[in-house]
Amino acid sequence: ELAEQFGRSLAKTHSVTPASFGAEQDGFIGLAPLPNRPLPTWEEFYASRRVMPYLRAAVDRGALTVEQAAIIERAMKQIHSFSGDSEPPALLHGDLWSGNMVWGAEQIHLIDPAVHGGHRETDLAMLALFGTPHLQKVLDAYNETSPLQDGWTERVALHQLHPLLVHAVLFGGAYGARAVAAAQSLFDHATSE
């Protein structure tokens, strides 16, 4: 089945280890600029290149209040508490949602990448965000090929902060509230352990 084949292929793509977290050139995600300058750890890269620029823009555009933004900012200050064990950079698609997957007769083709070195859970969290068909089959095949760290499903919300904030900036609506809920869920999960 295509979903299993895709899960295995994605795991193999993620096994490619770029030199750093980030990329040498900045890019775009949709119409939004995407800062990519490399940083030594995923946590630094994700907080400063993915979440914080869009958090500021979401507040400036009225998609989040200052109080809501403070919850996400607090999560970024505590990102090491939520991020799991460190992993080497993985080669990511970077904008891997179902709309960038073209299901062919024999394989799934990916379009519109925002390629960079990142955390492999980021691509998987993006797949979960907007309803990828046969997602569980994709994830099972991925995990068989390249086992994920324990607790990765609890970190999905962390990895979804960036795309939710990008959508809050570009489209407004409920995306800002969803980003706040994702950040709050990190704190809720941490206190329930």
Predicted regions and their residues:
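An acidic site on a long C-lobe helix of protein kinase domains
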Residues: 2, 157-160
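Hydrophobic packing residues in well-ordered alpha-helices of helical domains and bundles
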Residues: 3-6, 68, 72, 179
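Active-site Asp-x-Gly
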Residues: 42-47, 56, 88-91, 98-157, ...
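Active-site catalytic-loop/activation-segment of kinase and kinase-like phosphoryl-transfer enzymes
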Residues: 29-80
